[in-house]
Amino acid sequence: MSDPHPDLRQPLERLNENEQLKARSRHLRGTISEGLDDLLTGAVPGEDPLLMKFHGIYQQDDRDRRADRRQRRLEPAYQFMVRLRIPGGVLDKHQWLGLDCLSRLYAERGLRITTRGTLQLHGVRKPHLRPLIQGLLPLGLDTIAACGDDSRGVVCGANPYLSQAHERLQKLAQITSDRLIPKTGAYADIWYRQPTPVRDDEEPVYGELYLPRKFKVGFVLPPVNDVDIYGQDLGYIAVVDNGDLIGFNVCVGGGMGQLDNREDSYPRLAEEIGFIDADEAPAFAELVMGIQRDFGDRRDRHRARFKYTLDRLGLPWFLEELERRRGRPLEPARGIHFEHNGDRLGWQQGDDGLWHATLYVESGRVDDALRTQLGGFLQQYGGRLRLTTNQNLQLTHIEEHELEQVRWRLEDLGLDWRLTPDAQAAHTLSCVALPTCGLAMAEAERYLPELLERFQRLKGQYGLREKPITLRLTGCPNGCARPYLAEIALTGRAPGLYNLYLGGSFHGDRLAQLYAGNVDEERFLALLAPMLERYAGQRRDGEHFGDFLLRKQLLEERPLTSLSS
């Protein structure tokens, strides 16, 4: 077996540049404050943009304007994306209305619901970063650890107000998130201008190097796999007995990101390893994250995710190390069953009699019209909202006596169609991609409406228009919209060209396979047409498209389209 300490035993200078940056950053302070105060440039210079990710902020520029600004000898049109930390996606209406106001003041590209059930504010200029983050404070919100080499925002599946089990699931997700947040004083120092001394013991869990890469934690309650639990570094699958949440099946090692030009880079499904009691979940997460902190690869950043640590050292080694730290082995996993990984749109009633409405939001984009509509509704009804990991929005806590009036009000505001959208649209995700994401190689969100229209037209030719198929579109292979768990996925390779993946599960528990590389829209539709035709005529009752492709062995013969770069 390889040395279980391949990196932390090495001198710092032998680790990758990001590790060295963290070590000299004074627990994520760097020179961010000085960069914010320099108004001669719209950017934060040097290494600080990497550190700002730990603060929930990405430095970007408008790629549509690069050539023009270069020709005019101007610096890029710098702007920032600010991501909030909202464990489980739960907000009250005052927080939402406050965010609406802040986004109108500071976010030129508006609000977007992410595939981890939080919000991003796009198009924030550098002088507006501090006022924005200071404006979040009285709302009880922040952005710390929404990005960076730490535990990203903890996701939690399903509406927490449907039952006591759902509510407890949300509370445990919140406790876990709070436990895994970095403790550095850098956030208050930089953003609230509250000077804090740098201490050696500032990060008792993370240490000065934090994690090798991001670490994603998710909670889910079957039969709905709405967070795609098998794509998480650490996943908790709720086990409910007579309405009580008694514990979790634990799964480890999931992850979506990959590089197309490296064979040792790949998506991976998380593996179920056993069962724990419900109350242990927060402490257990710290244990697992600690193993990744100590043994993750800190030399090759592209191999630093937890999935690669497990594959490098082996699952038996991990279970042995986990047992040593925990003091006892895991119990056997309990039986669970998933039915789908989408949201249940429309109306649902909780055990307490209250009603909740889930609204479809295209690619999670909360445009000006939707913000105005939601503002009008929340000023009259509702107390809380919830953001889903499928980029939708739930209006919760509607009393029975209000229900009819609320239905009328949603219709008056033009929101009622979002309760019953097109079935295919409701099962489709995309990432932001161009023009702001620096990693995007092709369009995604802006292209999705056109692609979806043509795909629906093709399905309609075979009588499948109302049959949902999970479809995901991303601008690069990094997997932000969890493409490798979809029945059909396109990941960007170059402008207008994508890799086509097929055969994932409708339940989110099987990886899709690379079927064709560098396909354009016409080739994509041409490849799918005969498969959809056979699916229409030969599928079994209730059989999903991905399952059909595997049963009929339609993915065994790859087309001639190049799979190489």
Residue ranges and their predicted role:
Residues 1-565:
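Peripheral terminal and linker regions in Fe-S/redox and tRNA-modifying enzymes
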